[in-house]
Amino acid sequence: MNRLSKMAVNRIATVGPRFLPFAEAASEDLPLSRLLRLSMFQVSVGMAMVLLVGTLNRVMIVELEVPASIVGIMISLPLLFAPFRALIGFKSDTHKSALGWRRVPYIWKGTLLQWGGFAIMPFALIVLSGQESAAGAPEWIGILSAAVSFLLVGAGVHTVQTVGLALATDLAPREDQPNVVGLMYVMLLVGMIVSALLFGMWLEDFYHAKLIKVIQGAAVATMVFNVIALWKMEARDRVRARQRLEGDPEPSFREAWGLFTRGPNARRLLWVIGLGTLGFGLSDVLLEPFGGQVLDMSVAATTKLTAAVAGGTLVGFAWASRVLSRGYDPMAMAGWGAVVGLPAFAIITFSATLQSEPVFVFGTMMAGFGAGLFSHGTLTATMRSAPKAQVGLALGAWGAVQATSAGAGIALGGVFRDAVRIRRSAISSARRPYSLSTRSNWRCWSRPSSSATG
């Protein structure tokens, strides 16, 4: 029996990595168990994204009856901090600490910001809606408090994710860094899928008290996940601290950014990232209200749409990793992702004519698949275009442009929806903005081709 057990263990050790995406990211210095524990911060980020873009988007528009334009602007507020992601990553690279820590202080501050935003958010949203006990409250109090809560969560999410990815890159051997970053984003999508399913189950029967429990529970979970991720992860290096205090001054952010943007096709690459992300982002604020108002889907059913998007993105990310590891052009991969988005949004629009939830869900998953191909392609291209000493800055630049464009798309999607609703019926107002996403993706298709050849 002992012999059979040894044979089974050896067999699993040999075959297992074939079925574990990014298993090659682990090393002797960074085993898979430690790497997965570090990736817990991505789970908290994915949970926040589901709440902001998915669950609260639907709840604010349908249940709380907040105008879609206000909802779009509120959801886009966290992305005001997106342009600072490159600066945050640069500051954590050059941070001077008596303990020699560079990443931990920034991740902890980001965690506190995220926790504080979630703590006050449910009460701010109820005041914003003006329902029940908040019926007599001044409107500006609800708008201001909701805006502050969204801003706090946004600042925390961007800080935690940017510096967390930099910490993961620090801990991994250089040859494994791309796979480690890929694993981090896979864990982000896993966190989104699990969170979307749980939120959908908990909000099956919606009422204000349950909304408060869910959002404040997310605040507690954020603190727990990030503390687990940080615990004994970054070593205290007093020698490095002394060297930074006594050594030559670090280059300024302007100098470092100038060096990065002078790289081959760097500016063109950032434009491609922005246009493609804008195309996919235009639909984010519309998916769940579309399902609720056009197809009469429940809160739980529309919340699970976020899991469908994340699932499609996860498949796209895994497929892109497999193809790119064989030497395929990353910008060509990004171009194919934009092309996949064209029929995806057409299918979503056509589902209203058929009044078919399965068609709608299929189109949503297809859009997520295209977004996964596009994101992985642009991320890989960004990392390959960066100098060896600026991989962290390159990751920050990629995240800054992508998040800023996503926020612009979310805000424009809500504004377009309300503008079309003035002249059209409720069904057509929910359908027409998807054509805007299709047009933006079509413009982006020409960009990656020129970037790849330029």
Curated annotation (Swiss-Prot):
The chain crosses the membrane at residues 35-55, 70-90, 110-130, 140-160, 180-200, 211-231, 270-290, 299-319, 330-350, 359-379, 391-411. One of its GO terms (cellular component) is light-harvesting complex. The keyword Nucleus does not apply. It is a multi-pass membrane protein. It is found in: Cell membrane. It comes from the Bacteria. Keywords: Antenna complex, Cell membrane, Membrane, Transmembrane, Transmembrane helix. InterPro entries: MFS_trans_sf, PucC, PucC-rel. SUPFAM superfamilies: MFS general substrate transporter (SSF103473). Belongs to the PucC family. PucC is required for high-level transcription of the puc operon. This is Protein PucC. It comes from Rhodovulum sulfidophilum.
